[in-house]
Amino acid sequence: DFFFLPRRTDAEISATIVELYKTRLPRTYGQLTENGIQIITPSRRGEAGTEHLNRLLQAALNPAERGRAEMSFRDKLFRVGDRVMQTRNNYDVLWEDDETDEADVPEPEDVSPGRGRARPPQVAGREWDEEPESERGGVFNGDIGVIVDIDVPERTMRVRFDDRVAIYTSDMLDDLEHAWAVTVHKSQGSEYPFVIMPMYSASTLLLTRNLLYTAVTRAQRMVILVGRESVIRTMVENNRQSMRY
């Protein structure tokens, strides 16, 4: 299914996207939206880019709450329940079995993991069933998970990817970012049931037919474009091949 929701300003675009994610899609499609809504943007920057949208979505879906731990790191605020993405391969992260008691984790309105963790590379000379769980390492670029624990005094976090938990120390947090909204560049190779894409003014180097095609083809069930028709027209007519973010 395909829908286009015209909006004039970037503020209207971002407000509509938050409403779609938080209320309209879950109300209409129910459980089909669990783990399945992904916002894909041309750029990180701007009022409808990933950085601003993720701040809005964190406030709407996983707000500050008594008993819900949070920790600041540079310009980011991480909170238990946040949806996050690993941004580069790191083979030094240690894994542990996910023994999180779901009743003990404050549940935001959407803590869907989205794309699961890729399997870590096999250690040479070992079969997988011979390797102790505590020794399996590695988290990979594009993996999406949910923060399940934050130890503020120790400056560490635990992030659940599928059925295991990765332990993050403070020196690893540069490689973690919020993932309710991601760039088209970061979405490559993934698929999602529902894709929402803002159509807002960005660099013409980014507003290309190839980028629009890549974003739209990430959707398995539904695509919703939100914004200005003129931006869609620009992207369709711009046949540049490079795609950066």
Where are these regions (language model features)?
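Conserved helicase motor core of P-loop NTPases
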Residues: 1-114, 119-136
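C-terminal accessory regions
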Residues: 109-113, 117, 122-136, 141-245
